[in-house]
Amino acid sequence: IVIEDTNLKLPGILSYLMTYVGTIPLIKSTSYIANKFPKHLYDALENNNWVLIFPEQEMWWNYRKPRKLRRGAYYFAAEQNVPIVSTFIEIQPLPKLEKDHPDFYQTKYIVHVLPTIYPDVSLNAHDNSKQMMEKDYQKKVAAYEQIYGKKLNYDFTPWDIAGWRNKANLPK
């Protein structure tokens, strides 16, 4: 799992897990990303390990819509000639309230594994990464529209945050 280096400073057992379960830290330094980070990825992939990167850079809690993707993960995949396993996470609200957050219902997550995206060896890493990123985004949009039965648009509605007990989300 590629994680921001700040996650290594989490309290207690989380810090231990983040440090010792084979995570690859991501440090916001051009020098690190250009020199050390690719070596960490290469080493992991050479040992037949999978690498998990969230290409949208950050997760928004319970946000249902696919986010615009960032090209970095696709660039490294293209550069190392490895596929992208595309996924879409469906979020469904449950009837029970969150224990510590009464403004939210509990939710469940369903991971949909979409068709794998392979690099095109005839393209350079830059063009390949753009093509892979676009294919992945289109797969995520298609999954969203099929699962939720609605066309994707980015106008915000309270429904976009799964489980939110906003008045607009409550039954009439």
Give residue spans per PLM region.
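Non-catalytic C-terminal accessory region of glycerolipid acyltransferases
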Residues: N35-K172
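Catalytic core of membrane glycerolipid acyltransferases/transacylases, capturing the structured
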Residues: I1-S31
